[in-house]
Amino acid sequence: MQPLSRGEGRRQEGARLDIFAKCGILFLFILPGLPGAAGLQKEMSSMKYAFDNANLIDGTKDMRVQPGLCVLTDGGTITDIVPAGTAPAGYTRIDLRGRYLLPGLINMHVHLAGSGKIQKKQRDNEKLVRRILSNPVSRAVAYRMVCGFARDELLGGVTTIRTVGGLSTFDTRLRDEIAVGRRVGPRILAANEGISVPGGHMAGSVAIAAGTIDQALAQVDAVHAQGADLVKLMITGGVMDATERGVPGELKMPPEMVRAVCERAHALGYTVAAHTESPEGVRVALENGVDSIEHGAK
């Protein structure tokens, strides 16, 4: 995949923003992601704002459009919702002029190593990742692309993402840079590299290939040292790297490894997410301590 030129990136970003403008829709706290310095995101999180004259869609089960409202924020936190035109003194007023205001969306399953577009043909991702991470120049290019994919999430209205397998320590690095205002992007809960087995799903690309329980536990300790937010397992085969029918749901990780990883992760205060694409994979995950099932396809 070739990185966009600066001009191409600006044109695509402008097109996305134009779509939002035409639809008259704003996602709450997406404003820091609009054109401007990353410092604006940090500034927004430390000031008082009144988003006035909004048509509010609050995200509840029985949500209806609620016209004529003003959303008050302080330090990046919603503090009140009041009638339009009644914001108290001390707030910077932003007149939405009847645009629709939504809560930020949350994407619970993200791999920032990819754009999310459909892969047209099989690739040797392990070989590709090894080549990318082998020198500083290609690493820098790859990290820039990861940052761009995260920004795309924000521009699409996603204000929080949960990564479940990434390149090296890119995800925690980007999470921390966004948190201090160096980069523009959503809040990130990061797993960094997941844990697979030799020949398993994403082994060698966005997950390490653990041949033994000790190697799997070493990766749990590694992501703990990296400051990750969760642990990711690849229990069954997957669709994207399957070379023959039946592989996606095939059990790859032994149950005893799943249990050992979950016990170590839980002792360190982590939850464990697991890629499973078969009833057998789901059963192994649930019986051995996994906290969340990813995909769960049959």
Question: For each predicted feature, which ranges?
Answer:
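N-terminal metal-binding scaffold of metallo-dependent hydrolase/deaminase domains
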Residues: 26-29, 39-88, 99-102
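Divalent metal-coordination and catalytic microenvironments
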Residues: 54, 71, 76, 98, ...
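Metal-associated gating/positioning segment near the N- to mid-region
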Residues: 100-177, 288
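Active-site gating loops and adjacent loop-to-helix segments of metal-dependent hydrolytic enzymes
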Residues: 114-142, 184, 192, 196-204, ...
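Divalent metal-dependent hydrolysis catalytic cores, especially in the metallo-beta-lactamase
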Residues: 135-136, 145-171, 185-196, 228-242, ...
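Short, acidic/polar
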Residues: 142-150, 211-223, 277-281
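Active-site core of metal-dependent hydrolases
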Residues: 198, 237-298
